[in-house]
């Protein structure tokens, strides 16, 4: 889990500081990693995008799309009993968060020149803290591909 604090002005001009919590379970990470398997997985695709954007060789659209996907998939809140939840009464918390100024500030900051250097550490903080063994992940991908006759 990673915790980010963003600051912004409220509608009445007041200063607001909001804490954002982002986390993916191993299953969520595996699902996202499979979506980017044509690029060598999520982390490899992220690194390629970062290199291309920093070198000026790429439009920002793929980076924006990836960040939106990851941030919204990982967004949730910590409960009083220490659990991390992404739904309340059947509603995804990310649905409301996506329209918030906090989300906007986080996304705009990450896409800024100084924010680009924060993207990889942010993503590495979102993935499961007990790590995802690359060999285990590859074996699971192969099992899924074999089951889907994609191997």
Residue ranges with predicted function:
Residues 79-151:
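C-terminal charged interaction modules
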